Design a protein with these regions (language model features):
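Helix-loop boundary and gating motifs at the non-cytosolic
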Residues: 3-76, 80-83, 90-93, 105-108, ...
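Hydrophobic core of transmembrane alpha-helices in multi-pass small-molecule transporters
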Residues: 34, 103, 119-139, 332-349
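Transmembrane alpha-helix termini and helix-breaking/packing motifs in multi-pass membrane transporters
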Residues: 49-54, 81, 85, 108-116, ...
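Loop-to-transmembrane helix entry/capping segments in MFS-fold secondary transporters
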Residues: 59, 153-163, 275-276, 361-375
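Helix-to-loop junctions at the C-terminal end of transmembrane segments
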Residues: 75-91, 182, 292-305, 392
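Cytoplasmic membrane-interface "Motif A"-like loop-to-helix N-cap segments
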Residues: 85-101, 190, 301-314
Length: 439
């Protein structure tokens, strides 16, 4: 078979299906995933931390700001009360996403540049960041409900694996282009200027993302509840035990994952001496390990979404212990080793994780269920970030000694994070059968 015929008959081309509206919807979703990942790579993570540091934000400030997005996401509880009043939501959702992008990428950037007083800047930054994320939380579940029509259950494993390839490629592209530049200018008088300019580049990609998301067909939104009430966000999910158990797992994992996130990145950049590019080796290794995605899909079919997730988490969790021993003199080899293990396990972990919000979600009234998912999962992230920030405040400048090695705050957090991941793994293994969706 010729290469052209293989491409024409491939799963990827079949998934995009140029003859159907659903195929167009998936194409737009994948392109949006590519664009939004570039935006996220610049406006969050290591480049975001470097941007804050270049404008004299401390590790305590960074930890505090890391709490705000997950706190704001908890307010998506108001989303269905607002969105369920509209059967056509395309332009409403686009307006909300545009406002969120402008606040995050334009207003925050200008404030950091022009406001020099540290206290005023932190207060203003917090207010704009909170508003931006509040707007996003109000509209994000609307996109999820709309786009879920394009990925029926039989296509999800394939769709999410290709989405993972695309988003990882976007992360790799953006972080290598912008990460190398940030590392080259680190410590120079141009560092803050270039990191600021990157956020305006991200704004351009964000505007294109808003346009792309307006293109798919919008289907009617099925619902069983005639009245639109806030209490339905709690009342409806309480009827579905499997859904609740799934959301509890998501919340627990988000708590664990958020515990050390911002502090660890700050520690790598400023205490270990790793550059932005080095801190994102995960993306390099992931793009290599993505060739194993078909095998992870087969494992999901053979075992289950949840058991695959648990086995991958068993590989991921011990890397926290490896990372805790990273030092300026050994990070060149130890950090890549831990990151490679994370990338290998991360393919299966992220593939199974992507379906978690949907696997046990009822087909009707999905705005309520997905809003409940966002609230509880965001609450887990918020509590994890808050616990991490409190840990930094309490143990800042303190050390413990293990096996003759002195650990300061950030490595100490990784020991705690390892324990939190173990709790999640045990939860899945004990409840695997009860978590399985009905056929």
């Amino acid at each position: 078979m010729s290469l052209k015929s293989r491409i024409r008959n491939s799963d990827f081309v079949a998934l995009l299906n140029w003859q159907e509206d659903d195929g167009k919807g998936r194409r737009c979703m994948l392109l949006s995933a590519f664009l939004s990942t570039i935006v996220s790579s610049i406006s969050t993570g290591a480049l975001y931390t470097a941007f804050l540091a270049s404008h004299d934000f401390s590790i305590v400030d960074t930890s505090f700001l890391g709490i705000i997005p997950s706190l704001a996401a908890c307010f998506c509880v108001l989303s269905p009360v607002f969105l369920e009043r509209f059967q056509k939501r395309r332009w409403l959702l686009a307006g909300g996403k545009l406002a969120s992008y402008l606040l995050n990428l334009l207003c925050l950037t200008l404030l950091a540049v022009f406001v020099k007083d540290p206290r005023t800047r932190l207060v203003g930054f917090s207010a704009i960041l909170l508003t931006s994320n509040l707007v996003n939380s109000l509209f994000s579940s609307g996109y999820s409900v709309w786009h879920l029509n394009f990925i029926p259950a039989k296509l999800r494993a394939r769709y999410f694996s290709y989405q993972q390839i695309i988003t990882t490629s976007a992360t790799l592209l953006s972080l290598f282009l912008f990460g190398f530049l940030a590392d080259a200018l680190k410590g120079t008088t141009y560092e803050a200027t270039v990191l600021t300019a990157m956020r305006f580049v991200a704004l351009g990609f964000a505007l294109l993302d808003v346009v792309i998301l307006c293109l798919p067909k919008e289907y009617p939104y099925p619902k069983t509840e005639k009245s639109i009430r806030l209490v339905n966000i709690i009342r409806l999910p309480l009827r579905h035990k499997k859904f609740l158990m799934t959301i509890l797992l998501i919340s627990m994992w988000n708590f664990a994952a958020s515990f050390s996130a911002s502090s660890w990145t700050f520690h790598l950049l400023h205490n270990i001496g790793a550059g932005v590019t080095m801190t994102n080796l995960f993306s390099v290794f992931t793009i290599i390990c993505l060739f194993t995605a078909p095998y992870w899909r087969r494992l999901i079919d053979k075992l289950s979404w949840f058991r695959t997730f648990a086995y991958c988490a068993m590989l991921h969790a011990p890397t926290m212990l490896l990372l805790a021993f990273v030092l300026p003199e050994n990070y060149i080899w130890l950090y890549p080793l831990a990151t490679f293990i994370q990338a290998f396990a991360g393919v299966g972990l992220n593939l199974s994780w992507a379906n978690m919000p949907y696997i046990n979600t009822p087909k009707e009234d999905q705005t309520y269920y997905l809003s409940f998912h966002t609230v509880i999962s965001s609450l887990g992230s918020f509590l994890g970030s808050t616990a991490g920030a409190m840990f930094v405040r309490v143990f800042d400048r303190m050390e413990i000694t293990v096996l003759g090695r002195h650990f300061d705050t950030a490595p100490m957090m990784l020991f705690v994070q390892f324990g939190l991941y173990v709790v999640c793994i045990v939860y899945v293994l004990l409840n695997d059968r009860r978590l399985q969706p009905k056929e």
